[in-house]
């Protein structure tokens, strides 16, 4: 296919237009008074949403050059979501501000490579400063505040997530699922999560979220390497007759067997997924046994004389729900409390008896996974549209809470970034030449999130930013009440991990845009549809 090649300022301005199109759609959702965005869906009702990364993923521009810019911002949102699970809108606003400020300086004659170096040094400096001012999250009240802010100032959700954290522990598993009722409830059940994902992306059930989600699945748990599909055929037929999904947890599944599973899954013959077993060596066997106890199944192993072709559905594990992503598998089990308690007691005994520090650590890890359970937040709402939006908000809140526990918190509402910008004078003086301009680009862009929060609340962003700049570090603008106050005391707080990821990802993409000198895209094809032929018959006469 023929390519379109665009250079210099034309290329950068095309990227900027694409960045603006996407960022302007996302930025209206920022802050407690942020608005919603309606997404048209090919099937079903439109989706009304307030989640930055979900909006970004939906946007595809007609102009190929501009679409390249939009895809770059999409990358910022997606990467921030992967790392921190929240802060995607802030990342988009920062990236847009950085690109705008940077392009002004490039157009004025600054060298893009020097600007890039200055920006990179400034981001490293700001990340170090964020770590210095971070406060650890202590107590369930602080956890509830972080969760409430991320869920759109919903105190009920904040308290529910704090209760979930108390129950399953800070490292525990919290899942969010849709409820059949109108109310949102918290339920704690047996379950575990391990760090292995699906072996093939073709096995996902939800293409948008790239997850395989199964209700009431059977689990085939084996320490064997499955290399030929004939070993599996008898049990696959039994499961298909039972009409339930099957999740295979095995040492490995080789190409031929996997290809057959994928083909049958795509044809709709089987609802199946496969996951590699967690751990290594003897520890793997022990972890498979843990999963078997949790799900009331058996480990299919040559050691116990059970062959794959002879397995019955009674020997399979049973779960209430399973969610498999590219990195993790979460099992929500049926009530099998007595067996789980007995297994936990056995592991505790091993912890007491072992002399090896390494073994003790690994046994404690297994005990935590098995005994911690899974907290399930069942989201209820009056309509499907509200349910989807509420579920996304709660997922953001869970991620933000975990991020806050990991790296601490800073004042929210864009305040921390603005105060850090105000204190950059000494650092900028330590830089040389055009690197100073790169630092000033970041300094100016750090105002972006606070300005946008104020504008979404119907106020003049620059006036609010100027007032906040002269306040103490913890003090800022509360857009919910339109008051200037101590934001940490008021519970308006952001996780450092979210703020840091947003800044790093935005600066990375902005530096790439500024140093772009050429874009190559597919040339739009001309419409080759032949013109309609003239109608036959007699000509018209006056």
UniProtKB/Swiss-Prot annotation:
Q: Does the keyword Nucleotide-binding apply?
A: yes
Q: Which Pfam families match?
A: Cpn60_TCP1
Record: residues binding ATP: 29-32, 86-90, 413, 494
Kindly state which reaction or reactions the protein catalyses. ATP + H2O + a folded polypeptide = ADP + phosphate + an unfolded polypeptide
Species this protein is from: Gloeobacter violaceus (strain ATCC 29082 / PCC 7421)
- Domain of life the protein comes from: Bacteria
What HAMAP family does the record point to? CH60 (MF_00600)
What main location does UniProt list? cytoplasm
Tell me which CDD domains the record gives. Answer: GroEL (cd03344)
Instruction: Please provide, alphabetically and separated by semicolons, the GO molecular function terms listed in this UniProt record.
Output: ATP binding; ATP-dependent protein folding chaperone; isomerase activity; unfolded protein binding
Family in the record: Belongs to the chaperonin (HSP60) family.
Q: Kindly list the places in or outside the cell where this protein is found, as annotated in its UniProt entry.
A: Cytoplasm
Cite the record's note on assembly.
Forms a cylinder of 14 subunits composed of two heptameric rings stacked back-to-back. Interacts with the co-chaperonin GroES.
Identify the NCBIfam families for this entry.
GroEL, PRK00013.1, PRK12849.1, PRK12850.1, PRK12851.1
Question: Can you supply one Gene Ontology CC term for this chain's record?
Answer: GroEL-GroES complex
The uppermost taxa in this organism's lineage are: Bacteria, Bacillati, Cyanobacteriota, Cyanophyceae, Gloeobacterales
Question: Which PANTHER family does this one have?
Answer: 60 KDA HEAT SHOCK PROTEIN, MITOCHONDRIAL
Keywords of the record, alphabetical order, are: ATP-binding, Chaperone, Cytoplasm, Isomerase, Nucleotide-binding
Keyword Signal included in the entry's annotation = no
The role this protein plays is:
Together with its co-chaperonin GroES, plays an essential role in assisting protein folding. The GroEL-GroES system forms a nano-cage that allows encapsulation of the non-native substrate proteins and provides a physical environment optimized to promote and accelerate protein folding.
InterPro entries named in the record? Cpn60/GroEL, Cpn60/GroEL/TCP-1, GroEL-like_apical_dom_sf, GROEL-like_equatorial_sf, TCP-1-like_intermed_sf
Q: What does the entry give for GO biological process?
A: chaperone cofactor-dependent protein refolding; protein refolding; response to heat
The protein's name is: Chaperonin GroEL 1
Instruction: Supply the EC number(s).
Output: 5.6.1.7
């Amino acid at each position: 296919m023929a390519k379109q090649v665009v250079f210099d300022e034309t290329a950068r301005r095309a990227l900027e237009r694409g960045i603006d199109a996407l960022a302007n759609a996302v930025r209206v959702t920022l802050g407690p008074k942020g608005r919603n965005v309606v997404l048209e869906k090919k099937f079903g009702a439109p989706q009304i949403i307030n989640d930055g990364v979900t909006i970004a993923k939906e946007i595809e521009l007609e102009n190929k050059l501009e679409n390249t810019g939009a895809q770059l911002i999409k990358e910022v949102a997606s990467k921030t979501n992967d790392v921190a699970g929240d802060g995607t809108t802030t990342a988009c606003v920062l990236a847009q501000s950085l690109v705008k400020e940077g392009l002004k300086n490039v157009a004025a004659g600054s060298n893009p490579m020097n600007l890039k170096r200055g920006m990179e040094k400034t981001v490293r400096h700001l990340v170090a400063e964020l770590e210095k001012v971070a406060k650890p999250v202590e107590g369930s009240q602080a956890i509830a505040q972080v969760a409430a802010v991320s869920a759109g100032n919903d105190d009920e959700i904040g308290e529910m997530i704090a209760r979930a954290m108390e129950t399953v522990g800070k490292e525990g598993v919290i899942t969010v699922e849709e409820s059949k009722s109108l109310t949102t409830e918290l339920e704690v059940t047996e379950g575990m999560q391990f760090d292995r994902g699906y072996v093939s992306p073709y096995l996902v059930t939800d293409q948008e979220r790239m997850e395989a989600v199964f209700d009431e699945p059977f689990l085939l748990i084996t320490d064997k390497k499955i290399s030929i599909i004939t070993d599996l055929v008898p049990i696959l037929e039994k499961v298909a007759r039972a009409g339930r999904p099957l999740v295979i947890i095995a040492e490995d599944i080789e190409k031929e067997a996997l290809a057959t599973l994928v083909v049958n899954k795509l044809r709709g013959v089987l609802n199946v997924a496969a996951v590699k077993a967690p751990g290594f060596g003897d520890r793997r066997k022990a972890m498979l046994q843990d999963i078997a106890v949790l799900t009331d199944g058996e480990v299919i192993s040559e050691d116990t004389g059970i062959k794959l072709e002879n397995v019955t559905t009674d020997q399979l594990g049973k779960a209430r729900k399973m969610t498999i992503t590219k990195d993790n598998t979460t099992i929500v089990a049926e009530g099998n409390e007595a067996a789980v308690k007995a297994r936990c007691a056995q592991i505790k005994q091993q912890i007491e008896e072992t002399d090896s520090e390494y073994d003790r650590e690994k046994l404690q890890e297994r005990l935590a996974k098995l005994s911690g359970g899974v907290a399930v937040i069942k989201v209820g709402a009056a309509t499907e549209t509200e349910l989807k939006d509420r579920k996304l908000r709660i997922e953001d809140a869970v991620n933000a809470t975990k991020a806050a526990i990991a790296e601490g918190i800073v004042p929210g509402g864009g305040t921390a970034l603005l105060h850090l910008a105000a204190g950059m004078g000494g650092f900028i003086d330590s830089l040389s030449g055009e690197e100073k301009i790169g630092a000033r680009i970041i300094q100016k862009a750090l105002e972006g999130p606070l300005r946008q929060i104020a504008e979404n609340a119907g106020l003049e962003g620059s006036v609010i930013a100027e007032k906040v700049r002269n306040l103490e570090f913890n003090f800022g603008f509360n857009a919910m009440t339109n008051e200037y106050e101590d934001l940490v005391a008021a519970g308006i707080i952001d996780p450092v991990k979210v703020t840091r990821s947003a800044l790093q990802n935005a600066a990375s993409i902005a530096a790439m845009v500024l140093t772009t000198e050429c874009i190559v895209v597919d040339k739009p094809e001309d419409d080759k549809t032949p013109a309609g032929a003239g109608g036959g018959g007699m000509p018209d006469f006056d």
